[in-house]
Amino acid sequence: MLQRELTRLQNGWLSRDGVWHTDTDKLADLRALRDTLAAHPGTSLILLDTASDPRKVLAAVGVGDVDNAERVGVTMGGLNTRVSSSVGDMVKEAGIQRAKAAELRERAGWPNYDAVASIAWLGYDAPDGLKDVMHDWSARDAAGPLNRFDKGLAATTNVSDQHITAFGHSYGSLVTSLALQQGAPVSDVVLYGSPGTELTHASQLGVEPGHAFYMIGVNDHVANTIPEFGAFGSAPQDVPGMTQLSVNTGLAPGPLLGDGQLHERA
């Protein structure tokens, strides 16, 4: 399907008014997907949608055997997340996340310690400017698709007790919160660099007590400052029932610490 869509956009199309068209932005998205999949063996294209959004290709890329993984992480980004500019880094981070999870499971003596997968979810029209990011419109639009994606994972897995963890970064933490508030088969949730959650209690996320977490990076102006404006309700650190995770482990490589969006990755 990816190659078919690449060919279609490369060839272009003739409109009814006799003008030849192509979509260079979506073509850049598809090329980035192709190159990322080729550069990272063991990845798979789980979602490809070239029609729903007029400006962007929507996609999700899995690292590891998603269908047979006992533990699956789903990560979504925030401001300026777009396939052409983000998929490479997000898939690289997903690979690091998966490798670290497998390592910890092996150290703990888990059988099938490598039965872990990580998904980079770029399935929504993320805000691409400070004006748009100050509203929750995009998050509310994206919550439904993310909720359905999580439910689809649970419905199609070959593992009877697959454990899904939702990771939401920056504006993506708001999307994740809203998606889980609709009821999703997620066991754990981690919100980091969050501008707000639109939560009054962690129980609204639908996970068991003690399974809703947050992280705040060093000099994280988004997590520490934007919630004060109240646009997205309480920050996760102010929501009863949320548990803080340390960001002092130093697991992330240096280039992944900053994303250039006013705060640092946790």
From Swiss-Prot:
InterPro entries: AB_hydrolase_fold, DUF1023
Superkingdom in the source lineage: Bacteria
SUPFAM superfamilies linked: alpha/beta-Hydrolases (SSF53474)
Pfam families assigned: Abhydrolase_8
Protein name: Uncharacterized protein Mb0988c
Organism expressing this protein natively: Mycobacterium bovis (strain ATCC BAA-935 / AF2122/97)
